[in-house]
């Protein structure tokens, strides 16, 4: 099931194609995802400066109430008490056994797993054929059935594209994929602006189309005068 993917008892199973290996027995090789995302304490305030990450309400609402991934990834309460300011906590990497240390655990981090392959396959078929194929439905429904939610059918190109965008968020959240997805879909800037406004952050004021790419390191431009800086970063070029 979905929760097993993020359990040390099932690490490096078939779902995991490539994972960063961690070991709690060695300080330099232990993971700290729980430290940064939380919670591991009873009070949210204890994460100030080293965590306290929260999910926007719009993301929480992307889940069906019966979706098994919801209760594994997000939480509105901790031991029966709501979080401060009604925040939504990220608990994806929380060890349900209670043996995990907040800043010192051995849970591997998934870089590439089978669910990602299925979602990429379904997305590619929809883009290629201009509509979802039987194989595309099979791929995405395999993931949805594992999550305990209904299969989908009879969608057009745009509907299936929107479904894939939401399904990747529900399935792969906090695994390091979202920015790359938003860039690929051409909606990075509008999404950052919208979410920033929702959570009352100023981040949306500074994002621009230039952020679809990173700047070419100045050291490389100095080495090769034929290199042109990526759009939006030209002022860094000498």
Regions found by a protein language model. Give the residues of each.
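Hydrophobic, small-residue-rich alpha-helical packing segments that form membrane-like cores
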Residues: 1-3
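Flexible, polar/acidic helix-loop-strand segments at domain edges
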Residues: 58-114
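Extended, hydrophobic/aromatic-rich amphipathic alpha-helical segments that build helical scaffolds
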Residues: 18, 67, 109-143, 161-175
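A broad, low-specificity signal marking well-ordered, structured residues that form hydrophobic/aromatic
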Residues: 15-17, 68, 91, 140, ...
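Long, intrinsically disordered, low-complexity segments
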Residues: 8-43, 49-53, 104, 109, ...
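Conserved, well-structured core segments that form or line functional sites
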Residues: 148
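Active-site rim segments in enzyme catalytic domains, especially the processed small/beta chain
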Residues: 37-61, 66-73
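Residue-level signal for threonine
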Residues: 56-57, 133, 217
């Amino acid at each position: 099931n979905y929760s097993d993917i993020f359990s040390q008892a099932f690490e490096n199973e078939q779902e995991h194609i490539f994972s960063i290996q961690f070991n709690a027995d060695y300080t330099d090789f232990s993971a700290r995802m729980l430290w940064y995302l939380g919670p591991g304490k009873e009070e949210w305030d204890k994460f100030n400066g080293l965590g306290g990450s929260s999910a926007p309400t719009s993301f929480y609402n992307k889940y069906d109430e019966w979706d098994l991934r919801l209760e594994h990834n997000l939480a509105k309460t901790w031991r029966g008490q709501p979080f401060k300011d009604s925040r939504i906590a990220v608990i994806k990497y929380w060890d349900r056994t209670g043996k995990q240390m907040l800043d010192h655990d051995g849970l591997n981090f998934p870089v590439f797993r089978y669910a990602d392959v299925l979602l990429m396959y379904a997305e590619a078929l929809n883009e290629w054929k201009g509509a979802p194929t039987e194989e595309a439905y099979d791929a995405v429904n395999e993931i949805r059935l594992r999550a305990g939610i209904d299969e989908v059918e009879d969608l057009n190109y745009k509907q299936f594209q929107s479904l894939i965008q939401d399904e990747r968020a529900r399935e792969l959240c906090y695994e390091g994929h979202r920015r790359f997805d938003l860039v690929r879909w051409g909606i990075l800037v509008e999404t950052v602006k919208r979410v920033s406004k929702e959570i009352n952050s100023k981040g949306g004021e500074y994002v621009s189309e230039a952020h679809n790419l990173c700047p070419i390191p100045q050291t490389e431009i100095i080495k090769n005068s034929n290199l042109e800086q990526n759009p939006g970063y030209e002022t860094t070029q000498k």
